[in-house]
């Protein structure tokens, strides 16, 4: 009765979780005539939803309870996982909890958005990000960051090629706006006072 139907069930996991491996055993999955392709039914959608929910919950558990192991995972699969930020609006909040990045204050350690938000300084009402530079060291040397450094504002340093696309879905975290440093405008008088 139990038979292997397909090797890669792309309809059962979202693209940003394509790194997971496993077996789905269900008597309710309908097949097409060739028995090689799943029919897109409510059952398949329900299975996909449950797999996504369980995988994201397990990743959060690992991130919270075994942060060193999670960072190893992030180094290998973070570029794939963060693609879910603009792709999956329903799971975006959960994916943002798993997101890690280097920052202007932490170029060697990965930081979560939660940590960045919790450590915002007085007067900072936005989480800032900068993309499209190959290394954090290059980014920190940019003149555009001077105003942020003077204010002691942390800036997310996003160096992966896909980050330009990722930030299109990253406009807010936990009711705090996320903006590009190119949108940061500083009052000249304020800078002179410092």
Language model feature labels by segment:
Residues 1-194:
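Conserved GHKL (Bergerat-fold) ATPase module
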């Amino acid at each position: 009765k139990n038979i292997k139907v397909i090797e890669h069930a792309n309809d059962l996991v979202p693209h940003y979780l394509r790194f997971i491996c496993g077996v789905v055993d269900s008597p309710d999955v309908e097949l097409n005539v060739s028995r090689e392709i799943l029919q897109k039914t409510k059952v398949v959608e329900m299975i996909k939803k449950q797999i996504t929910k369980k995988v994201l919950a397990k990743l959060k558990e690992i991130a919270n309870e075994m942060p060193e192991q999670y960072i190893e995972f992030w180094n290998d699969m973070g570029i794939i996982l963060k693609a879910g930020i603009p792709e999956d609006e329903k799971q975006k909040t959960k994916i943002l909890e798993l997101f890690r990045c280097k920052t202007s204050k932490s170029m060697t350690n990965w930081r979560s958005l939660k940590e960045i938000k919790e450590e915002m300084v007085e007067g900072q009402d936005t989480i800032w990000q900068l993309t499209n530079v190959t290394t954090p060291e290059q980014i920190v040397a940019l003149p555009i960051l001077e105003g942020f450094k003077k204010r002691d504002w942390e800036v997310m340093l996003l160096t992966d090629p896909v980050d330009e696309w990722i930030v299109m879905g990253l406009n807010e975290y936990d009711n705090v706006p996320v903006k590009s440093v190119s949108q940061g405008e500083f009052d000249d008088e304020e800078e002179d006072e410092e």
